[in-house]
């Protein structure tokens, strides 16, 4: 399974999964139609699947146009998003399986950003290979999504679920937010040397207009404050030892940053 990162809108990423053996594609969170069509045409591939993580327009905006062009498309989304994802036919819950190419993905229910948010996790199939996580707006490189519909407790549970995936899991998050996320992270975890190194690397990469997605679970566990709510430095920064309250105060600071 090949994965292509397609920039869209101002800072979105669409992900096109390609099965070179059957020359078919699946798209994750198509915000715009043109980048998807252009990549499919360059591959000569047929689109067969849409995997949506949640209902926000910058993740489902191209659903209708893609269905018009590929009438046999199957559209997947979370069961809690029934009626909110255009063209949705398959309603997924925690633990359901999805199939593409030679990979079997697991559905993870990760409410917080929205109440119906799901993620798609494709475990590695061979020693030394990476797992692949398509997590929408739940976990970002260096950050996490705003809480538009869910609660801090829900988001902590969701992020903990993602944090427990293998360290060599690649994180295909849906926005290029890393620079600003790490700019905030430094303010609450300034003595973290791993974070300092990553901040320098990301500044250089973005200065060259290079993408910082995908990230890795192992990297996020060392540098992302929203996966480090038990760390004394972060608890001290927000004056709380309670995990949910620590997260909520960090998220509140980030919202105002």
UniProtKB/Swiss-Prot annotation:
A biological process from GO: methylglyoxal catabolic process to D-lactate via S-lactoyl-glutathione
CC cofactor: Zn(2+)
Binding locations of Zn(2+) 1: 54, 56, 113, 137
Binding site for Zn(2+) 2: 58-59, 137, 175
GO-annotated molecular function: hydroxyacylglutathione hydrolase activity; metal ion binding
InterPro entries referenced in this protein's UniProt entry, alphabetically: Clx_II_MBL (IPR035680), Glyoxalase_II_hydrolase (IPR050110), HAGH_C (IPR032282), Hydroxyacylglutathione_Hdrlase (IPR017782), Metallo-B-lactamas (IPR001279), RibonucZ/Hydroxyglut_hydro (IPR036866)
Reaction(s) catalysed by this chain's protein: an S-(2-hydroxyacyl)glutathione + H2O = a 2-hydroxy carboxylate + glutathione + H(+)
Enzyme Commission (EC) number: 3.1.2.6
Highest taxon listed in the record's lineage: Bacteria
Keywords: Hydrolase, Metal-binding, Zinc
The keyword Secreted appears for this protein: no
Cofactor: how bound: Binds 2 Zn(2+) ions per subunit.
Functional pathway: Secondary metabolite metabolism; methylglyoxal degradation; (R)-lactate from methylglyoxal: step 2/2
Statement: the UniProt record of this protein carries the keyword Hydrolase: yes
PANTHER family: HYDROXYACYLGLUTATHIONE HYDROLASE (PTHR43705), HYDROXYACYLGLUTATHIONE HYDROLASE GLOB (PTHR43705:SF1)
Recorded family membership: Belongs to the metallo-beta-lactamase superfamily. Glyoxalase II family.
Oligomeric form and interacting partners: Monomer.
Protein's UniProt name: Hydroxyacylglutathione hydrolase
Organism: Trichodesmium erythraeum (strain IMS101)
Gene this protein is translated from: gloB
């Amino acid at each position: 399974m090949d994965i292509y990162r397609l920039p869209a809108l101002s800072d979105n990423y669409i992900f096109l999964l390609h099965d070179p053996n059957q020359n078919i594609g699946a798209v994750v969170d198509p915000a715009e139609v043109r980048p998807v069509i252009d990549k499919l045409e360059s591959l000569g591939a047929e689109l067969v699947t849409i995997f949506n993580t949640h209902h926000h327009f910058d993740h489902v905006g191209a659903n209708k146009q893609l269905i018009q062009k590929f009438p046999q498309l199957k559209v997947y989304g979370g069961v809690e998003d029934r009626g909110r994802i255009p063209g949705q036919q398959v309603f997924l819950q925690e633990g359901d399986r999805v199939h593409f190419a030679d990979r079997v993905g697991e559905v993870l229910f990760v409410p917080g950003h929205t109440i119906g948010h799901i993620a798609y996790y494709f475990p590695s199939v061979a020693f030394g290979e990476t797992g692949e996580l398509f997590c929408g707006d739940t976990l970002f490189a260096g950050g996490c999504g705003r809480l538009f519909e869910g609660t801090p407790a829900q988001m902590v549970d969701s992020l903990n679920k993602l944090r427990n995936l293998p360290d060599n899991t690649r994180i295909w998050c849906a926005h290029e937010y890393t620079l600003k996320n790490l700019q905030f992270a430094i303010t609450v975890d300034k003595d973290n040397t791993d974070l300092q190194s990553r901040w320098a690397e990301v500044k250089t990469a973005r200065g060259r207009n290079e993408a910082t997605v995908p990230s890795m679970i192992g990297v996020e566990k060392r540098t992302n404050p929203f996966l480090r709510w038990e760390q004394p430095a972060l608890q001290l920064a927000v004056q709380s030892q309670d995990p949910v309250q620590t997260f909520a105060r960090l998220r509140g600071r980030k919202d105002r940053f």
